From Swiss-Prot, chains A, B, C, D:
InterPro entries (alphabetical): Aldolase_II/adducin_N, Aldolase_II/adducin_N_sf, MethylthioRu-1-P_deHdtase_MtnB, Salvage_MtnB_euk
PANTHER family (alphabetical): METHYLTHIORIBULOSE-1-PHOSPHATE DEHYDRATASE
The protein's name in its UniProt record: Methylthioribulose-1-phosphate dehydratase
Species this chain originates from: Komagataella phaffii (strain GS115 / ATCC 20864)
Protein's job: Catalyzes the dehydration of methylthioribulose-1-phosphate (MTRu-1-P) into 2,3-diketo-5-methylthiopentyl-1-phosphate (DK-MTP-1-P).
Organism taxonomic ancestry: Eukaryota, Fungi, Dikarya, Ascomycota, Saccharomycotina
Keyword Mitochondrion attributed: no
Residues that, per the record, bind Zn(2+): H121, H123, H200
Length: 240, 240, 240, 240
């Protein structure tokens, strides 16, 4: 797999048949396949997944649901979903005409290394811009919205004056290299719930899909605010 | 209570039973529980209550309705509402699985000190940014939109060339300290219908929910405009 | 009348009875009372009529329909509309609990001096900001969108390289003085279909409600673009 | 034809009768006439086709569907559509009261020179602004979103570190001259799927309507990002 966009040369793995519709068709609006479609529309309207960019995955027990590559996010339907068994990494369902998301190994990293319940990847312009201004990490402190972000290494959320630190990894031509550096960042920053990718975007995960969504929203708010602070020459880490 | 976000360690006070559904379930779209849900969606779409931030409360006679902590604002339903008796400060209704908003003592200040009918709290980025540029108060004059803001100490609204002054209080780690300084600001600025909180957001109240909404909207417009004026080096208080 | 916002001291003129409902209640979505409500929602979502600011009026033959003062634009209903006879300036319909828009004499100027079919007034932030950067007139040339603006003094629209000139009048505490200067601007600039009001907003009119809407939209686009050009030091009137 | 806006002096060519309704009336939401209306609403909400500006056309086999001139994009209905035979350039359907889009010869260029399936023209402010900052071409490299853009001259999309180059042509008073320079740009830049028009906007095409939409979205994202990078003094082509 070579990118989060549709890779033309990529062979669709056909371990699961497209007839496994019961895995994704449900009247329950909280079914992962339905939630992915709903959230993709929200993210599209925020400008985070423009032009088929970005991705989202939800885990339910040992099954992970993944939005496909190359489909317009605001037009996603449950029938488009890939379903994978987390342990074996075999596809339980593969839509015949679609290609799996190149984000899949990155989502798997969050599931396996952090026991995440969902993982969101956006091409948010605020995320891209912040990676052009910061070097190894993005840092911000003493903004109330920081309280929405979890400490991860212990229970509870960051305090108002705590410093939020999000590592920035370098983008790569080849997806495999991005997986390696994402895993390294997750190890080096045990307290982070997100990783920025330079000139690319951001990965955010959480214990549940709703927590992942809230973390992503709060982080994007902080990235936007940081850019406005930078424009006025105000440091994002408050000096005392 | 430690923040407007969900405080994990906080004990939910169970003075009222969740069976008191008749307090919040109504076909009337103007019922406070319905209005709170409707307005939360509007505020979410404005980017004012991102990531479960912010809050809103409406008073109807001696009953106050308060949106809970930690619930995504755009997904709020009437069943999520807390109801409190204003005088005794006892909860008349407490949703079992939710925590009361940490904004509650701040909302109570507006109700008790100003006889407000509703109080809105947002994490508007314009509000946060303005508190990074102004010291003790935000001031603006000679903008038509100022006419939407009430004089408070006497009948009627501000005139075009009047100076709108909104006090800025310092944010605190602990909610109790914020309540004290909010009350002090309300006393020191008898003509204000809003208080800015540094690096946090804004509290706005009004005689009715619609007035509070209009004041909040008009103030946010003025805060945004002030930031644009600042960028161009134009003072927000017109010099004659 | 003292402002486009609700003037508390102002006596509602009760020349028409509120029972004249047939003037505003219609199943036809193109009825002026319905169109005003629909367009107010559009303008609200554009941030042009925040906090009850701004106004709109449509003329049908000798009857003019006017949105009331002090009502939230996105919650307007046909029953809120005032109806006036253009020639006598008598109200044909006066909603009992509402106050007529203070914009009324300004709308009348566009109807009487220019035979307009509709007049739109917004508090667009782009309009306000432009009046802080330009002196007597706003000018822009050589932008394709200019072709959406009419020549007024002759048939057809401006050409690409034509110069769009919109006069700027000073805002006033008292509405009457604004009416005078608006009329003067209309006389001095026979080719204009809009007048900017310093630190206040803009008035735009057209032969029909749709033309007024398109002109207002195109002008606001040009005002926004002019602000971006200013930020980059690019003159809005192209130098050859 | 003199502009993308309604040209008053232009004779409507009545080669086809308006009774040819079967060409545009369909229950199928993917019918070109329905898709044009749907996408015009999306583009309007993005601010790309404000004030009747811009245009869109879809080809189905030898028939091309074209949105008319002078109609508000968000209020377009299938009955407004022109239908033309690509080879003969004869109109198969001409709505009686409407004028054909002045973009028609430009759309035809994309169909004939590139075998496009759809062509989108917007007055995006990001497009206009970029043409004020760049000379002969707009260039950007090493941004992940570039991967959404096709190579055109060979299969597949651009790589992350590839340089996206979009030619900029000069705007003209007369439409004919724009057609000539657009065709010249298409010839000179065989790898481009878009052409910017100075002080005017952008033309984007693709093999299908969905590809054209995705390309246009991804390019606009890159144009916006380029403007933000310029503001911070960061070159859009990454230097190694
Ligand atoms: Zn990506
Ligand atoms: Zn708060
Ligand atoms: Zn006004
Ligand atoms: Zn055009």
């Amino acid at each position: 797999m070579s990118s989060c966009f549709c890779s033309k040369s990529q062979e669709t793995e056909k371990r699961g048949a497209v007839s496994e519709d019961q895995l994704v068709i449900s009247d329950d609006s909280t079914h992962p396949a339905n939630l992915i479609c709903e959230l993709c529309k929200v993210f599209y309207n925020n400008g985070w997944v423009t032009g088929t960019g970005g991705g989202i995955s939800i885990r339910e027990g040992s099954k992970i649901y993944i939005a496909p590559s190359g489909v317009q996010k605001e037009r996603m339907v449950p029938d488009n979903m890939f379903v994978m068994d987390l342990e074996s990494e075999n596809y339980l369902r593969t839509p015949l005409t679609l290609k799996p998301s190149a984000c899949t190994p990155l989502f798997l990293s969050a599931y396996k290394m952090r026991d995440a319940g969902a993982c969101i990847h956006t091409h948010s312009q605020a995320a891209v811009m912040v990676t052009l201004l910061y070097d190894k990490v993005f840092e911000i402190s003493s903004i109330e919205q920081i309280k929405a972000i979890p400490k991860v290494t212990e229970k509870g959320n960051l305090m108002y004056s705590d410093r939020l630190v999000i590592p920035i990894i370098e983008n790569t031509e080849r997806e495999e290299d991005l997986t390696d550096s994402l895993q390294q960042a997750i190890e080096e920053y045990p307290g982070t719930t997100a990783v920025l990718v330079r000139r690319h975007g951001i990965y955010v995960w959480g214990e549940t899909v709703w927590k992942a969504k809230v973390y992503n929203e709060a982080i994007d708010y902080l990235l936007e605010l940081a850019l406005k602070m930078h424009q006025l020459g105000i440091p994002t880490v408050k000096q005392n």
